[in-house]
Every structure is written in C-alpha cells, then in structure tokens.
C-alpha cells in the first residue's frame, strides 16, 4: 500500500533530482565509492550478501543480492558514445552514467572543484544548478584551532584571543507576545532543534534593561520583528551597536519603514524596506558572509517562497542598503526571474556585524518536492543562526549535537505493515515485517514498525509483532485498524471503542478514535509494551487526529512528509508556528518522512504511483543515498518509510528487492558514519530529554572552555556536545564516562533529572 498523502500534486517533481554534497574523502571507502559500485555494476557482479538470521520460530530470511535481477536503469547513452561517463560530470540534461538520474554529480573524483579563494573557501564539489555546472565551496567562518584556515585569510589557526560566552539572547518586541507568542515559540523551537543555548526574557522585560551588560553575556542577539521605533529606540540602538563593535552579532528580523523606524534602519545600515507579496524565491549568494557558510548546496541557496503569488501571496520585506553604512547583500529576492532587491544584508561594525532578514524563514517556504528528495528549506534558518553564533563567538561555540553519540546523523528505518504479505506468513515465507526485521538485525540496525491491526479482514497476526520484538524492534506503533483514509467527514467517535466490538467494514462505519485506540491497544498488547508512536494511513491527517493521539498517550507521530515542513529534524508540535489548527499545541514530536519506497505524479491519465522494484532500484538507491548524505552534512536526520510488501502490481520477488535495497542502504549509512540503531520512540525520548537539558559555557583564550550541564525534568542519556574547536581534552568529574572525538564529546551515562555538572575543555 502506498503511504503518500499527496502523490498527485502537479508541482511535485521527480524525486530523483538531487546532487551530492560533502563526503569525507579521507575515509577508506567513501559512501560515494560504495554507491558507485552499486550503480555501475550489475547485481551479478556484487558479492552475495546473506542477510538471513534465525528467528524464534525457525524461519530464515535469506536474501542474496546475486539472486535478484540486475539493478540497472534503462540507459539512452550507449557504450562508445562520447557522452557516456563512468561518473557523471556534465550538466547537460542527460543521464551520462546510467544510474537513473539526470545531472547528479557525486562529490568525489572528477567533481572536485576550486574557486578563487584561500583556505577552506578554495575547494568544494561541483553540482548542477539551472543547467550549468557550478562549484559549491564553503564560505569563511571564524578561525578556530583545527589546523585549517577557517576564515580564508591565508593564515592557519590565527584565532582572535577572546573571553566570551557563546549564547543567544532572543529579545522579542512586546507586540509579538500580545499576538499570542506563536512566532516567538517557533523561533525558540528552532533554537531547541539545533541545540543552541539561548535566553528568552519574559514579555514584560524592557529592551534597554535586557541590553545592559550585553557584552560578555551573549555572542548573538536576535530581535524578531516586525521592528519599529517602539522596539528599537535610540538607547537600544546604541547598546546593540556597542555590542557589535566589540565583536558580537545582531540579527534583526523584518524592520518596517515608518516615521518611528529611523533608529532600526540606522542600526541595520538600510535606507528603507519595502513590503512585497510578489516574491517567488530567495537566492543566497553574492558576498560570502559568515552567517551563510553552511548553506552550500543549490537547494539551500535557492528557496521557493510560493509557486503562485497571485493565489498564495507571501509577505517579504525587500531591503535597500545604505551605501554609506558598508552594508553588503547576502541574499536577494526574485519575482519570477526578476530580481527585486535584497532580502538578507550584513552591516559590518568594528569586530562584529548586524544582519537583517526580510523574510519569515520559519513559517513560509513552499516546497519544490514532497518526498524522496533533499528539502532543507526549513532547516536554513537554524543553520544560519548557528553560523551567526559561530561568528559572534569567534568560532568558539558549544551546542547540543542532534545525535545521541559521535555520529553525524541518524538514518531512521520505519516500516508500515498494511498488507497481508507484510502482516502474516504465507507462500512467500515469513511475514514481510519479520523478514525486514531480520535484515535490520543482521546489520545491527533497529527499525520502527507501524502495524495495521486488520482483524476485520482476517490478516492481523500478533505473532508477527512478537517475531519483530524478538529481533529487538519494539516497541511498535499503530497504523489504524482498516487502513482507511481519514477525510474530515470521518466521525471522531468518543474513544470508548474496543476490540472486538469495533468492527468497521466501511469508512462510514469507522471512527477516528476507533482506528487509533484499537490499533494502538492491539499492537501494544502483542508487543508487551505500550504503543506510543503513530503513522496515519496514506499520510492522511484528520483535523482532530492530534487531539485523539494525545488522549491515547501517543508521544511521537510520523504522518507528514518533508515537503510539509521542509525540515529534517524532529519537530515539537506544541511550538510549531503553522498548522495549529491541527496540532492545538499538543505536545507530540513529529518526524517528517524523508524517503518513501514509492513516489507519485499526475498526467492526463490521472494519479500514478511508481513503486521501488528491480528495474528502478539503482535510481532509488542513488537518490536515497544522496539525500541521506546531504542531510548528514547538516547533522540532520533521514526518515525512511518502506513497506515490506509486494507493492502495487508486483509479486513476491519485489519484497526481496526491497529487502536487498534496504540492506545496501544500511551498508552505505554505516560507511558514511551514520547511526542506524535508534528507533522513533528512542529518538523521541532522547529529543525531549535533550530539549530540557541546559548547557552554558564560556571561552577564554588561556583557559579554554568552562561550563555547566543541567539535566531537565527527565534523565538524559547520550547527550553529546559539539564544540567550535577540535578538543585535546574534556574533563567533567561528575558526568560519568565520556568519549571524545574531534569536536564532539558524548556522555555515555545518564544524568539524573535536575543534576548539574561542571566541565572544562581545552582546544588542540
């Protein structure tokens, strides 16, 4: 069964349109090398891979890549054609290396490139943008002690001596609080997502009072808008200018042009701002400023605001720099193909800077793709803030890493059990769920299984849940009883529905409460542990779903795709700015689906769904690997949704194809240094505990880092700190065992609730 809620959108392009980015070529076998081997060779050329493991009932899953038909896409460029390449390097609209993808340049070998710059800014990887080959190289960042020329001035490790506190002050105008505070909570949730230490003063705090003594207490001050004179008066401007001159960074958001806004514009280094609703895209480029250093792919630099400004207008403030203020443009707004002005500027002040952003990145960004693609638009603001903090802290920041460990990111393997062959054994062998669990277990991975408990049709089998649990894949989640869609007209019910009395044979006889409550109850009973995770059939969300899930004790949901939120990190739905008509500030964690084993399109014949199968497996694998690695470069996660079933219109052999592709993806993830052994419920528990843990640190050029970690209301295990510098030592007597690698330190034990510990760390 397909689980895309919106496969028929005309604006959803092919998911196989992504480029690679940032692979560590120093590793013995890079992930791109492994993908090359998979794409360029037939399966018969690959070694047989036994993914079988004995199960409690004696069944054995034995899937061998060599037994499958070759994973080779149709190729229109024959051998001997001068356009044929072993690895694609051209941006010519042709699949030159026959991997099923057009103009996908892998970040290895011939795609290394250079630009006219020094230090780390001089080299990067080529990619295709607007039909042309471009070199995507990082911009400068503050110098730190790591053996590299980070600020690209031609000198290695010439870090500025400093005594500072890498922390953010969010100073929200009072009117944002009086509006309800949704924008403020959304900004705070982004800081929480990226583990950035911050303070958010109360609504009655006066600007001038909060800004006194700013120096030494913060490295970045964010003033969200709209901004007028009542937010930034003369005294506030002088404090902020003094802060920036001494090395701090200020980020202003959406200043207005009005009779009272002269001080705001003067601080920003702008002449005026103009409100527009015809902007369709934002393009980062021009001057390489430190705050956009991490935005180094085409998808991160070219953000779609709306596909139709006449039907869906979005407010953007175009900024006009003051030429006398040395203000530079870091991003521009476009109406169609016409540039209409600046949308991100930087005014240099002394040792620091004032940035101004004219667009609301945390709530308005139209998606270019729905699933099976690299969609980082919702992560751009977090990356920008993290780099702005890095600039204000002269590179010496401390943040909470997004992973419970030293790895760069997570691959979350999730599986919807919504077909007979995935739910129970038969002529095809063990249930598809059991076979998938065996593959995962064989690679040391942990999957999350969402069970449809269809006892009405007679294929619900609790023994399958028990076999999955025996392989370490529990707790499991709910996926409904009958796998119906959930239109708004579906009755909610009163949540008194019980098994076996709840017997819906049609959608009209079903209730939202019954589908959720009974599915969660049966799945939990079969697993022997409460089911606290949920995914809606077809990713179709009922308007009252989150009220019902919250009342049933669900803590984590995965019913949206990356195209819905444009983020690749868990979301706190209580603080999410938009769609509170659905969420009602319910405290669930949302994990958007990044990858799916099918994708949709619409043509004159209607809505179609293309399933993963032998003929397109190499294309899926290339696209999935590309997305996974590019997310990992941002420390963002990738959530895979794969159905361990035959698929639409295919027989038992297609299940074996899916198992083999997942096995190969797990190998690629391991080669790239990703964790694959974290379930959605484990990630939710870590994410909540991480959010409650407080980290505070200072940096001194003679003593290094000194700081504290305070656990929140729940115990936090696996908390990992990421520093701006590579470390030679980390000392925390009360932390328990720790492990240090490069810039990261993981606390191997668990800090009890409310426990406060002190640490010191010395750069190399």
Sequence positions of predicted segments:
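Ser/Thr-rich, Pro/Gly/Ala-heavy low-complexity intrinsically disordered linkers and tails
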Residues: 1-81
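Membrane-associated feature with strongest affinity for ZDHHC
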Residues: 71-162
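A glycine-centered loop/beta-turn motif at secondary-structure junctions
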Residues: 167-168, 182, 186-193, 217, ...
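Helical hinge/lid and interdomain linker segments adjacent to catalytic or ligand-binding clefts
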Residues: 169-171, 176-266, 441, 449
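C-terminal domain-boundary segment and adjacent tail
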Residues: 200-202, 384-406, 442-444, 561-562, ...
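A glycine-rich, often tryptophan-bearing local segment used as a flexible ligand/cofactor-contacting loop or short
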Residues: 228-304, 324, 334
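Metal-dependent polysaccharide deacetylase catalytic core of the NodB/CE4 family, i.e.
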Residues: 258-272, 279-280, 408-411, 419-424, ...
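Active-site-adjacent pocket scaffolds in enzyme catalytic domains
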Residues: 281-305, 311-316, 320-321, 337, ...
């Amino acid at each position: 069964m397909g689980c895309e809620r919106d496969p028929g959108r005309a604006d959803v392009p092919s998911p196989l349109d992504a480029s690679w980015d940032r692979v560590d070529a120093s590793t013995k076998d890079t992930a791109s090398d492994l993908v090359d081997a998979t794409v360029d060779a037939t399966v018969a050329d690959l070694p047989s891979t036994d993914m079988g493991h004995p199960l409690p009932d004696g069944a054995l899953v034995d899937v061998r890549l060599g037994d499958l038909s070759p994973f080779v896409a149709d190729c229109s460029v024959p051998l001997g054609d001068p356009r044929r390449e072993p690895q694609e390097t051209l941006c010519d609209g042709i699949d030159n290396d026959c991997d099923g993808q057009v103009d996908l340049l892998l970040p290895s070998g011939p795609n290394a490139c250079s630009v006219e710059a020094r230090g780390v800014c001089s080299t990067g990887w080529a990619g295709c943008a607007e039909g042309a080959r471009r070199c995507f190289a990082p911009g400068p960042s503050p110098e730190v002690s790591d053996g590299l020329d980070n600020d690209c001035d031609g000198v290695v490790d010439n870090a500025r001596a400093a005594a500072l506190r890498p922390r953010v002050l969010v100073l929200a105008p009072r009117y944002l609080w009086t509006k309800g505070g949704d924008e403020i909570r959304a900004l705070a949730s982004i800081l929480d997502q990226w583990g950035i230490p911050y303070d958010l003063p109360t609504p009655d705090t006066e600007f001038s009072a909060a800004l006194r003594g700013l120096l030494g207490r913060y490295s970045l001050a964010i003033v969200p808008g709209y901004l007028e004179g009542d937010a930034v008066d003369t005294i506030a401007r002088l404090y902020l200018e003094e802060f920036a001159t001494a090395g701090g960074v200020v980020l202003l958001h959406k200043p207005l042009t009005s009779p009272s806004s002269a001080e705001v514009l003067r601080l920003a280094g702008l002449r005026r701002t103009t409100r527009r609703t015809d902007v369709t895209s934002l393009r980062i480029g021009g001057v390489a400023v430190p705050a956009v250093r991490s935005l180094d792919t085409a998808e991160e630099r070219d953000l779609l605001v709306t596909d139709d400004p006449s039907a869906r207008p979005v407010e953007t403030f175009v900024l006009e720099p003051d030429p006398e203020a040395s203000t530079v443009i870091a991003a521009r707004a476009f109406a169609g193909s016409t540039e209409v002005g600046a949308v991100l500027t930087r005014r240099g002040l002394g040792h620091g800077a004032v940035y101004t952003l004219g667009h609301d990145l945390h709530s308005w960004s139209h998606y270019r793709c729905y699933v099976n693609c690299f969609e980082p638009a919702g992560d751009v603001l977090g990356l920008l803030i993290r780099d702005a903090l890095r600039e204000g802290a002269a590179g010496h920041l401390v943040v909470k890493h997004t992973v419970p460990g030293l790895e760069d990111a997570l691959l979350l393997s999730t599986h919807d059990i919504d077909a007979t062959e995935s739910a129970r054994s038969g002529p095809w062998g063990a249930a598809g769920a059991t076979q998938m669990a065996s593959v995962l277990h064989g690679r040391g991975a942990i999957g999350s299984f969402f069970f449809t408990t269809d006892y009405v049709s007679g294929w619900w089998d609790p023994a399958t849940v028990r076999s999955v649990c025996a392989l370490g894949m529990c707790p499991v989640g709910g996926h409904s009883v009958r796998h119906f869609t959930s239109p708004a007209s579906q009755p909610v019910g009163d949540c008194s529905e019980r098994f076996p009395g709840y017997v819906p044979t049609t959608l009209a006889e079903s209730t939202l409460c019954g589908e959720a409550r009974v599915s969660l109850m049966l799945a939990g009973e079969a697993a022997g542990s409460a089911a606290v995770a949920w995914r809606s059939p077809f990713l179709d969300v009922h308007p009252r779903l989150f009220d019902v899930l919250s009342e049933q004790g669900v803590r984590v949901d995965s019913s949206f795709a990356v195209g819905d939120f444009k983020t690749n990190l868990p979301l706190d739905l209580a603080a999410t700015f938009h769609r509170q008509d659905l969420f009602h500030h319910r405290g669930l964690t949302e994990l958007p689906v990044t990858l799916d084993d099918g994708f949709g399109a619409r043509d004159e014949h209607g809505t179609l769904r293309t399933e993963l199968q032998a003929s397109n497996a190499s294309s899926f694998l290339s696209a999935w690997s590309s997305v996974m690695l590019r997310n990992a470069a941002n420390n963002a996660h990738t959530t895979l949704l794969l159905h361990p079933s035959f698929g639409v219109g295919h027989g038992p052999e297609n299940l074996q194809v899916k198992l083999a592709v997942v096995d190969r993806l797990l190998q690629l993830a391991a080669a790239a240094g990703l964790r694959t052994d974290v379930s959605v419920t484990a990630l939710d528990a870590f994410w909540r505990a991480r959010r409650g843990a407080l980290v505070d640190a200072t940096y001194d050029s003679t003593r290094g880092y000194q700081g504290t970690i305070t656990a929140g209301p729940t115990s936090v295990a696996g908390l990992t700190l990421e520093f701006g510098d590579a470390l030679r030592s980390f000392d925390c007597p009360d932390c328990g065992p720790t492990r240090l690698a490069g810039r990261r330190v993981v606390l191997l034990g668990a800090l009890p609730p409310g426990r406060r510990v002190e640490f010191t760390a010395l750069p190399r």
